[in-house]
Amino acid sequence: KKNKKVFTHGHFLRPQDVAMLSALGLNKVKVTRKVIVGLLSNGNELINPGKRKEDNKIYDSNRYSLFSLLNSNSIKVLDKGIVKDDYNKIKSQISDLKNNCDLIVISGGASSGSRDFIIKIIKEIGAIKFWKVSIKPGRPFGFGFFNKKKPILILPGNPVACFVIFFLFGEVLLNYIQGNFSYKKSFFIVKSNFSMKKKFGREEFLRGRTFVKNGIMYVNKFYKQGAGILNSLVWSNGLIRLRSNKTIIEKNSDLEFYPYER
């Protein structure tokens, strides 16, 4: 219909949207460029996959999971790799990312001995807005800005916590940067197939897997919920949200479930 709005600002163009634009006779439309995200892992103990494993070393799984999450959001990634616990090297890499990216994502520094380096550097050339949140997993999570408008995420070093925090907050922030201001994480209500107790005043996000029984969708939680247990992410198909005011979860309770796949 004439003068009818087809798409709003910030709409991500899908194949069917391109078909619609073509059917309207449009061969050109104005779009925003891809968001550039700077990625950096920090820690003396980290090595890249494919390298020979040495004592007291761990493979850097965080950067690769973040890279995959970012690619699924049509993001251009500037990967700085692993930066060891050297103040000047860390500052140099962060400064470079600050000048060339729309968003900076750092993993590792938030829960290792090097976190003081990260926080000090950001305070020197930017500002920390908050540090540590009442969420499990993911308490050592920091957020700040450079030049009052360029955000930086400091993610936990534990791989599950890193994934959960970016899944919950990073994707929302990316959509906001892209102009999709109304974006919210999607969830639906499921019935718990388990019971448990939790700490009051803290939100928890359990790794869970849904199933349908007699037309009702239930969810099981992974038997072990540690912040470093990657099996829990592989086994699950989404996150179960336990609100901060809850202390007891009874079987057949209504719970919010955030699927990994949209």
Label the predicted regions.
Residues 124-262:
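Flexible glycine/proline-rich
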Residues 1-79, 223, 239, 259:
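Short, glycine/charged-enriched hinge/interface segments at domain edges or termini
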Residues 9-10, 25-31, 36, 94-95, ...:
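A generic local secondary-structure boundary/capping motif
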Residues 18-19, 49-53, 90-92, 116-119, ...:
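Short acidic, glycine/serine/threonine-rich loops at helix termini
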